[in-house]
């Protein structure tokens, strides 16, 4: 599951007390997730990742992760990891609540389109026309979720688990060698 957002009505004071009392779970939403689910985590939305998840998290480059609560986890040295309580409390939007799993409509391919980025999902089959991504539109991150494909422009072979940073000046022509699912992130 993923922990995303505060429940409606949770105030800064209530959340601070829950942190002191180790009762954070009562203040947050826990979403059961399955492969392919998408949740847009807006800036200021408290979130955490439960064990057993492999996620794609798109975020601004930063040397800091504000850890407000650590769910009883410890670091590799066996000691509790550093928390950033005050910084976290300052950055959490306490008026933001009730996030939801993004609904993926058959035939639709845009998972999120916000001011920071756009992410689209594509499913390609062998024999389909190549997916054409024009040069000069945006730099792109291409994430291969399943299958195998070739960038006909560069000759690069891409398979499940590969991530490919495509420069602004470079286009791509992606052809499936086997059924493939990929995410393309741009406009960042």
Residue ranges and their predicted role:
Residues 1-35, 45, 49-100, 104-142, ...:
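Active-site region of the double-stranded beta-helix
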Residues 38, 44-45, 169-170:
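Short, surface-exposed secondary-structure boundary micro-motifs
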Residues 151, 155-188:
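C-terminal structured interaction module
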């Amino acid at each position: 599951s993923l922990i995303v957002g505060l429940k409606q009505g949770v105030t800064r004071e209530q959340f601070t007390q829950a942190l002191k009392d180790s009762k954070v779970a009562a203040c947050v939403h826990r979403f059961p997730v399955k492969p392919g689910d998408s949740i847009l985590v807006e800036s200021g939305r408290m979130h955490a990742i439960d064990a057993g998840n492999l996620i794609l998290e798109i975020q601004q480059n930063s040397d800091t992760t504000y850890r407000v609560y650590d769910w009883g986890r410890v670091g590799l040295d066996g000691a509790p990891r550093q928390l950033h309580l005050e910084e976290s409390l300052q950055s959490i939007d306490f008026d933001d609540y009730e996030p939801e799993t993004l609904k993926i409509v058959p035939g639709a391919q845009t998972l999120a389109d916000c001011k920071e980025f756009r992410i689209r999902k594509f499913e390609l089959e062998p024999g389909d026309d190549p997916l054409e991504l024009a040069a000069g539109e945006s730099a792109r991150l291409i994430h291969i979720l399943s299958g195998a494909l070739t960038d006909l422009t560069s000759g690069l072979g891409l398979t499940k688990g590969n991530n490919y940073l495509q420069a602004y000046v470079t286009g791509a022509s992606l052809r499936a060698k086997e059924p493939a699912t990929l995410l393309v992130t741009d406009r960042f």
